[in-house]
Structures are given as structure tokens and as C-alpha cells.
Amino acid sequence: MAGNSIGQVFRVTTFGESHGAALGCIVDGVPPGMALSEADLQHDLDRRRPGASRYTTARREADRVRILSGVFEGVTTGTSIGLLIENTDQRSQDYSAIKDLFRPGHADYSYEQKYGLRDYRGGGRSSARETAMRVAAGAIAKKYLQQQHGIVIRACLSRMGDIVCRQYDWAQVEQNPFFCPDAQQLEALDALMRDLKKCGDSIGAEVTVMATGVPPGLGDPVFDRLDADLAHALMSINAVKGVEIGDGFAVVGQRGSEHRDEISPSGFLSNHAGGILGGISSGQPLLARLALKPTSSIMVPGQTITRAGEATTIVTHGRHDPCVGIRAVPIAEAMMALVLMDHLLRQRAQCADVACTVPRW
């Protein structure tokens, strides 16, 4: 009931709070015999970590991960892998002035209603700080998927506010602090971020995540559809308010003659479905987009109430991201990797002996 785990065969359980001593997770279901080191996980953690650029939160965490178990002599043993990241740059005093206030748009009010109390320091368990462990676990899945099955997962910032990326150059994504695939938009993004910092406000974003090399057959009927599990995983990311698979909400304006992905002897002629048909992967690239709200931790005064129900005004003075969509890029990759890893192992467990003569491309 606690909601701290995801996956069935490849299962990840996280723990920790924003201003607690440490963050950690247990990863079950990792196949034995895969070479694994802390360096394999650190690359994606460095992409996500706070303070990595002037466009993200000023909180500076090294996010150095430690592997506590499940790896012997540099190789996975098949047993539970324990991971730990210590928090080192907490400034809980930044939140002392608002400990009895509810930040509008945050989980403060709903957590208080659910538990009767809350950790007001940076949001506690509801903070996006928790996603560091998802990225660490996702790095394990990404390595296995790529090495064993040739599956490559990548994401990018496809929109920030009114700035929309028109060109998708994946080589460009890792060359700028926005994870933006369109070099022509970098100047506009920089100007927007400087304006947001100047006025103490924030902005929403869209992140696109894609997986190539996904084999057909992943996913189960009805409640365990691949797209259902993927949407669940992506919606669990902090600040995500919407998820699209394939053409998503654009299908409302399409006709069946346009939307259906016709098939030829050489393969599919389009990919409006985003690589999933009937909840099961088709072998085409998996494509999803997620919409992230603007963070509510801003310097602009807003109305709220105290725990006693009295009206008051609030200003959040902590260190926060003007656009959470930037650091959501490696998180989206991690969540897609966790879902694909779990479904791949489930498919192997049930259908490893299935032989299909229908062409695949």
C-alpha cells in the first residue's frame, strides 16, 4: 500500500526524503553475470543531479552512488542490488518560515490530509529528489537492455513554454544544458530562463522519450498493457500532468484512414501508434511525450492558509528549478527503461519458447 515500488519481475523499491540523511533503493530481478560498477550508474546521475548548470536549482549534491549489495567482483549476482546516495547539501532552515503554511500547488496540503503530519523540509518524500534513485536503477536497466537486446532509450526537452523544438538532432541533446535537440532554440531558451530567474517565476515543459530496438511482443492484455504501464511510470514522475503515447491527443482530429499504421512486406508505413498495438509492442520505435507543470516553489507571493486555516501570503525562498522539465529528461529515460526491462523479463518467463513465423522488421 505504501506505493514505493514499481515492476513485477524487475522490481525497484525506493526510500528517502529530500532533506533526510540519504536516498536509497533495492533493485530485484537483475539477471546474474552482467558487469556492473558505480561508474555505470554515475553518468545518468550526473545528468540529473542538482546544480549541474545555471539553469537548474542552486542546491549542489554530488549524488555519488554506492552499490551496497548484489555485485561481486564487478558482476551482478542475481540477488538484490542495494544502492545508496547520501544527501550533503540540505538547507532545512530555508523552510522554517513556512513549516506551518501550505505551499500552493505542492503536496503539502494533501500529505497533511492523508497522514496528519508532513515533512516540510523541501517536501520530504514528495520531493523530486527521490527520483535520483529511479535514475540509478534505470541505468542498470538501460545497460542490460542495450547490451543484451540492442534497445536504446533517449529523451529530450521538446518544448518549454511557447518555445517548441522543430528539429530533432539527437547528437545535439548532450551538447547543451537544456537537453534540447534543436540548436536554433538555445538562445531563446536561455533568454526565457534568465527572465524567469529575474522575476522569480517558473515555466512548464514537454519531454519526449523514445526507445528503438524494442522487440515485438512486450506487454500483456487488458490491465498490464505496455502503454498502460508506461503511462503509469511516466505519470509517477514529479510534476508530470499528462502523458501521450504515439500521436496521443492528436488522434482526436485524425481519421482511421490516416491513423492506422498500414503494413507492407518491408514493414510498417507509419508509426502513429507509437510502437504499441493492443497494449503489446509492435517492434517499431516506442514514443511517448510527457507534460510537466511549472514548479509552484517561486518567489512570486501567493495566497494560502496556515495549518489553523487562517489566510496568509507565502513566498518560497528555497533553491528550486525554474523549469523542472530540464532535469526530467534522464528521469523519463529511466522510467521507460524500468518498464521495458520488467516486460522483457516477463515475456521471457512466459513466452520464451514461442515460435512465430510472421515477419518482423
Swiss-Prot record:
Biological role: This reaction introduces a second double bond into the aromatic ring system.
Positions contributing to FMN binding: R125, S126, S127, N238, A239, G278, K293, P294, T295, S296, S297, R319
Pfam families per UniProt: Chorismate_synt
InterPro entries: Chorismate_synth, Chorismate_synth_AroC_sf, Chorismate_synthase_CS
Stated family: Belongs to the chorismate synthase family.
Catalytic activity: 5-O-(1-carboxyvinyl)-3-phosphoshikimate = chorismate + phosphate
Cited HAMAP family: Chorismate_synth
Descriptive protein name: Chorismate synthase
Signal peptide interval: none
PROSITE patterns assigned: CHORISMATE_SYNTHASE_1, CHORISMATE_SYNTHASE_2, CHORISMATE_SYNTHASE_3
GO MF, any single term: FMN binding
Keyword terms: Amino-acid biosynthesis, Aromatic amino acid biosynthesis, FAD, Flavoprotein, FMN, Lyase, NADP
Cofactor note: Reduced FMN (FMNH(2)).
Lineage, broadest ranks: Bacteria, Pseudomonadati, Pseudomonadota, Gammaproteobacteria, Enterobacterales
